[in-house]
């Protein structure tokens, strides 16, 4: 009888330890660097591969646009954050930064830094305060006016039929002439993805 009780207790303790081991807190403890250019669809959300595809297409089109390619000197552009017209949370700041950075690297366009206007105004006041030596003072009136506004929006359409899901993204970007208000350059990039709903196994 004592042997049976000991055996039962041993089994119970084993089960308890097993449950605690399975249900306890877990953490990612080992990692490695991955290739950022590799496309890997882990879920049905917008990802960095989608963003890169769109940015590459937009940049190539804007640089090839005749108003940019044939300009006597690089046009000056001010960029507005890309609008998110989807129901998904997408980092539009990163999208906008990626496009602007790639365009600057082409040396075909220049950008004025709109977000830093407040900081620049503070620096002008500081330069005029008398603590900065004359030859190194930076004065108002020398900033370059923008020739174009670069703006755009992301839209999406989702279709689900049974276990099948299709997601369609479209990014449209325009370069608007500051003087004439005409859209001189425009491009859109479409990304369509298919997913199949499957049972999640433990």
Regions of interest found by a model, annotated:
Residues 1-20:
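Sec-dependent bacterial lipoprotein signal peptides
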Residues 16-19, 71, 143:
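Alpha-helix termination/capping residues and helix-transition junctions
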Residues 23-108, 200-202:
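A structural "domain/chain start" motif
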Residues 23-30, 147-199:
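Amphipathic beta-strand/beta-sheet edge segments enriched in Tyr/Trp
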Residues 66-71, 140, 161-163:
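Surface-exposed acidic, glycine-flexible loop patches that form ligand/cofactor-binding
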Residues 83, 115, 179:
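Short, flexible active-site-adjacent loop segments at beta-strand->alpha-helix junctions, enriched
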Residues 96-98, 106, 111-161:
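Short, solvent-exposed, polar/charged sequence segments at loop or secondary-structure edges
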Residues 130-131, 197-202:
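Short, surface-exposed secondary-structure junctions/capping segments
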